[in-house]
């Protein structure tokens, strides 16, 4: 990528961060309200925020109770290495010979949900993607991790590669990782 394109990507990313900071929906805490505001769209980008790397889009970052319970760890790394989502992502990275710093992970929904595995009304997920997420694409063809993120991307006509959600209750970690790695290779 040329220096001009890098500057453009960085500028677009800063715009997405500002949009995330401004986005609100009643009933959902913001990252700032939970003590996680930073120069990122999602805290997981502290470790997986490569603006030119493969893009993986999930449903949400975390639920508010888990974010509060693990605040110290999340403030350092932006993710919980021992949860199923991240254990599968680590397997994907090993299969592809990549590190977390080589990829970009983001959710379609940038607010905190009330509990683990919460259902986000489709209208809320679309509103957040319209306000924030579409500005993170930066010309990349994303991998949609799970049906929720794929549904949002389809609603906006975004070309993407579908893959199972890393935390889906289907198959083994290895099976999910293999399918996600294949999707990343096709993106």
Q: How should each PLM-predicted stretch be described?
A:
Residues 180-187:
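A polyampholytic, Gly/Pro-enriched intrinsically disordered region
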Residues 169-179:
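Short, charged, surface-exposed secondary-structure boundary motifs
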Residues 122, 179-180:
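Short, hinge-like loop/turn segments at secondary-structure boundaries
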Residues 2-141, 147-149, 154-156, 160, ...:
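A polyanion-binding, active-site-adjacent surface
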């Amino acid at each position: 990528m040329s220096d001009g394109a890098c500057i453009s990507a960085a500028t677009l990313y800063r715009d997405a961060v500002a949009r995330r900071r401004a986005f609100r929906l009643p009933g959902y805490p913001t990252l700032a309200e939970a003590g996680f505001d930073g120069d990122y769209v999602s805290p997981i980008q502290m470790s997986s925020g490569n603006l030119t790397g493969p893009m993986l889009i999930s449903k949400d970052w975390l639920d508010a109770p888990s974010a509060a319970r693990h605040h110290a760890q999340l403030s350092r790394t932006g993710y919980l290495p021992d949860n199923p989502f991240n254990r599968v992502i680590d397997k994907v990275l090993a299969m592809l010979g990549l590190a977390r710093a080589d990829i970009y992970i983001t959710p379609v929904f940038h607010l905190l949900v009330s509990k683990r595995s919460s259902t986000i009304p489709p209208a809320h997920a679309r509103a957040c993607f319209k306000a924030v997420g579409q500005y993170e694409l930066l010309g990349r063809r994303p991998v949609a991790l799970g049906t929720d993120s794929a549904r949002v991307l389809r609603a906006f006509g975004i070309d993407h590669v579908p893959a199972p959600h890393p935390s889906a209750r289907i198959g083994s970690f290895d099976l999910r990782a293999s399918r996600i790695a294949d999707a990343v290779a096709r993106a």
